[in-house]
C-alpha cells in the first residue's frame, strides 16, 4: 500500500528556503504570491497490515522533527492529518 507523508514547518517557525523562493519568484516577475512555505513529501510502500498508529510513530520518531514540524498522512485515498503531529 502506498502511503504519502507530508512534512511541513509549524506556524511561527522561520522558513529561510521558502523566503528565498518567494524572493526569487518576485525577481522573475511573478506577482501575487504572498508567502512560500517549503516542506517535504515522503512516500512509503507498506504492507496493508501496517497500522495507522505505526505510521504515525514512524513520523514522530524519524520522519518529522516534532519540535519544528507537523506531518500529514495519506493512505491511498484516505487523509489523516495531525496539525501538531499528535493523534486526534
Show where each model-derived region lies:
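Long, contiguous binding/interaction regions
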Residues: 2-41, 47, 54-88
